Amino acid sequence: MCIRDRKYPELKEALEDLPIKVWAGSDAIAQVVQAKPIDMVLTAMVGYAGLKPTIAAIKAGKAIALANKETLVVAGELITALAAEYKVPILPVDSEHSAIFQCLNGAYDNPVEKLLLTASGGPFRQKTMEELALVKKEQALKHPNWHMGAKITIDSASMMNKGFEVIEAKWLFGVQPSQIEVVVHPQ
């Protein structure tokens, strides 16, 4: 069990008579993912927080189910090199990348020429550059299609998320950015 630092002493005391290990601190998740009975680790933390646990899991020989694109955005070269060194598969969980992965599964003798990623264009796709300069945070937080957390909503509205997905695809599928095309379509 992992817990925030401030509650650690209280929980540890409450569970001291039970066969439950309690971790706390910034290294807690990295310690947990190395546990013996675990064979696959789902990394679904937002942002840079997923990097350290992912590295620890790879070095412990655990398969990675990746739902944290930022890990590959900030350290794709390192993560893919470690995965190759430790013979650990990286399995994309995110919808588009998972679909591409499934399509490519078993197509070893058929090299990828191009990957297509789709984007709605966000709520501001019809705006001019001048209009975009006047957009307020509150407008960006009102996504027309779905409700998500603030960071992903801003990243989606600004198309930053799609940029992250291009970088993620580069590392997941071993292709060059020139082989990745983003098709913008409102639906």
Please identify what each model-predicted range represents.
Residues 8-9, 29-30, 71-74, 97-99, ...:
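Short gly/pro/ser/thr-enriched loop/turn and capping motifs at secondary-structure boundaries
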Residues 97-161:
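Conserved anion/nucleotide-ligand pocket segment
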Residues 11, 48-60, 69-88:
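Rossmann-fold NAD(P)-binding glycine/threonine-rich loop
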Residues 22-25, 42-43, 66-67, 90-94, ...:
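General beta-strand structural signal in soluble alpha/beta enzymes
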